[in-house]
């Protein structure tokens, strides 16, 4: 179904994509036209310029609907647009086409493409494909897949490549019980270059490992004074408690 020059056809077809299954969606009945309208007005919406389907997720056809597998939540997209056009739209979201080109390729027009892609982005199905390639060595495929899938949960990075760049540039200090510090650093390698040391100004994160015999409260207070974000990890008996994450930039207290 091609979009007409007024955009009304694209709005109607894109709106049909958003008929989500109330049992599976956090926003039942959300329509692409509504999401697209919000995306044009809210700067928190960063709709991909050249969308690509996220790694580790799959849109599966089920009769007249499409089911999202691998996302942070189960979703079902239905309606006439989903039945007739969503397959072609997903194929066009390969990271090489702009929204205008996707609209032309699929016949839904630029407005319909914007609305439909806005919905797919809100649902964690697509991310930004217009990003600079990563330098060698490349991240492990498993890490790339994880970063892509988690991107929708955090909403911080436009693409998994952006997340990988931030991860590679991170300065992480791990402090606390010496034996546990060594084990954690070994587990993080080679995903993250962490060091066994007290936090220093400019660090991205300090992981503070506390035990019954070594509570590490003093190091947490030191991080707070330096303005370094910290993640508390408490190990006692047979339990491990991760959190809270404390950022002096917005956390009210330790």
Name each model feature, range by range.
Residues 2-7, 12-74:
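Long, low-complexity, charged/polar intrinsically disordered regions in eukaryotic proteins
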Residues 38-56, 119-120, 218-234:
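Short, charge-rich amphipathic segments
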Residues 35-37, 64-67, 71, 80-81, ...:
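A generic structural signal for ordered alpha-helices
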Residues 2-28, 72-194, 232, 239-241, ...:
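Long, charge-rich, low-complexity alpha-helical segments
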Residues 52, 61, 167, 246-249:
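A generic structural signal for short, non-catalytic loop/turn and secondary-structure boundary residues
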Residues 2, 201-254:
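E1/E1-like adenylate-forming module used to activate ubiquitin-like modifiers
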Residues 193-203:
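Short acidic low-complexity segments
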């Amino acid at each position: 179904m091609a979009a007409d020059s007024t955009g009304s056809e694209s709005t109607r077809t894109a709106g049909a994509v958003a008929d989500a299954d109330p049992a599976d969606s956090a926003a039942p009945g959300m329509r692409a036209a509504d999401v697209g309208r919000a995306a044009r007005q809210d700067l928190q919406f960063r709709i991909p310029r050249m969308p690509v389907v996220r790694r580790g997720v799959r849109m599966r056809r089920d009769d007249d609907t499409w089911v999202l597998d691998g996302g942070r939540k189960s979703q079902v997209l239905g309606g006439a647009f989903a039945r007739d056009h969503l397959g072609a739209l997903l194929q066009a979201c390969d990271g090489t086409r702009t929204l205008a080109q996707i609209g032309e390729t699929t016949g839904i027009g630029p407005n319909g493409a914007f609305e439909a892609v806005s919905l797919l982005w809100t649902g964690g199905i697509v991310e930004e494909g217009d990003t600079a390639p990563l330098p060698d060595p490349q991240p492990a495929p498993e890490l790339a897949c994880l970063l892509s899938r988690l991107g929708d949960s955090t909403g911080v990075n436009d693409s998994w490549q952006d997340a990988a760049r931030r991860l590679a540039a991170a300065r992480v200090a791990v402090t606390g019980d010496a034996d546990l510090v060594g084990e954690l650093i070994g587990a993080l390698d080679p995903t993250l270059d962490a060091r066994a040391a007290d936090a220093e100004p400019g660090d991205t994160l300090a992981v503070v490992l506390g035990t019954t015999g070594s509570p590490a409260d003093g190091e947490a207070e030191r991080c707070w004074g330096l303005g370094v974000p910290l993640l508390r990890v408490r190990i006692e008996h047979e339990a491990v408690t991760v959190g809270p994450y404390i950022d002096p930039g917005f956390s009210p207290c330790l």
